[in-house]
């Protein structure tokens, strides 16, 4: 009888520890804070356009991105920074806000921009190897006359 109670207590303790771990992990993923920087982009008219970006450098930051965010203020974005040039692929799973993305080479030149659909599982791929990707509210690039060939001052 004592052995049965001891085994039940052990299982209960393991269950409580596992539950605490899962709650802590879920809360820490939601509380992810991104480093922010003020950057600028020279648009097609030669004007300097300021933008405040959140930096996504780690796998964890890149995986989280704008997932779950309902509102992304104008003049802000998220800059994904990769260690080397590669063909990039993004999707909008669990992302409720329409976004535009710019694929940027290692020199800071925008090579292409694309629009992305909320909650889409379809990937949006760069057509060539690039080092960076910049996500902004959909339409921001067009409003600011930013497109292929524009230069972003990188961190």
Which residues fall in each region the model found?
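Bacterial N-terminal signal peptides that target proteins for export
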Residues: 3-16
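Bacterial N-terminal signal peptides
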Residues: 13-26
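Compact, glycine-rich, soluble single-domain proteins
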Residues: 30-155
């Amino acid at each position: 009888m004592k052995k049965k109670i001891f085994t039940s207590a052990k299982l209960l303790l393991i269950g409580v520890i596992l539950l605490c771990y899962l709650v802590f992990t879920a809360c820490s993923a939601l509380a992810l804070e991104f480093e922010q920087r003020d950057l600028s982009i020279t648009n097609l008219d030669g004007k300097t356009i300021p933008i405040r970006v959140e930096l996504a450098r780690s796998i964890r930051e890149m995986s989280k991105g704008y997932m779950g965010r309902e509102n992304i203020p104008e003049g802000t974005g998220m800059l994904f920074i990769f260690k080397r040039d590669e063909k990039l692929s993004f999707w909008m799973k669990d992302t409720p806000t329409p976004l535009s993305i710019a694929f940027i080479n290692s020199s800071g030149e925008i090579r292409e921009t694309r629009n992305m659909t909320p909650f889409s599982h379809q990937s949006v791929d760069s057509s060539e190897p690039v080092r960076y990707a910049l996500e902004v509210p959909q339409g921001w690039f067009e409003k600011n006359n930013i497109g292929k060939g524009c230069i972003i001052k990188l961190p």
